[in-house]
Amino acid sequence: MRYIFLICFLPFFVFGDQLVYPLPKVVYNKQKAALGERLFLDPSLSKDSTVSCADCHSLSRYGVDNKEFSTGIGGAKGGVNSPTVYNAVFNFVQFWDGRAKTLKDQAKGPLLNKVEMGNTEKGVVAAVEKNRYYAVEFKKIYKDGVTFDNIADSIAEFEKTLITYNSKFDRYLMGDKSALTKTEQEGFGLFKGKGCISCHNGVNLGGNMFQKLGVTVEYKDPKSNLGRYDVTKNEEDKYIYKVPSLRNVEMTAPYFHNGLVGSLKDAIVLMGEHQLGVEFTKKELEKIEAFLKTLTGERPPRFVK
């Protein structure tokens, strides 16, 4: 398991540029992805045909619904903030507690979750088989046709296409030093120098390790969500979560697993206190926030409204 509890400031400041990378190209099956897109947008996969994957993960809203908790079938509310599906292919595990190892495993979860889409494997398969388009396409693409596993596979293949390329920061990393303003570059320097990059690194600036919320100052979650503990039942895993990606972070409020922080600036303050043990000055906050906004990339044009 990937845990990091020690923060070593100087090495991250000196070598920080080598810890973050521009988004790479991803190979995917176009036929499966096209089918998966239809399924992702289709509410008939839920028990009462009212909720689609896109209702909680709006593709025009950078893969979230901007709500504290999403609404499932019958108006039920979920227990954690819905993470973005954009760039999820680069996460080392899926969900806040890391219970799904792959996109395919993750795709199965909401379909069967009683609060979210509330269906069964047989129910999902039956809904898909009723649709003539689906029936024909599954026979073309999969030897065994419509199965629950194949449905999840096609949705996962579509999610591989949800990558937000061409952010200002990616252009900067690829050699265009004029892509960031002086303030944004200073914000990146603070991001490295203060230790943010110790957890938010790699191609996704996060999503590649677990971390405790409350490293330097204890964080008491009013929602009593126990994070990784819910999967492992190990006491040491309480309040440990997958570190979220910071890509498109300005667009994905509210923040954290409990959705309790509404502004990006407040999220930076909280992280400084509980994870780094630092209190940022007003100027530092402004610069770090300016840098984080350079991580906003471009959605596929058809999802821009």
Task: Label every PLM stretch briefly.
Residues 3-12:
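Sec-dependent N-terminal signal peptides
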Residues 15-305:
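Periplasmic c-type cytochrome electron-transfer domains
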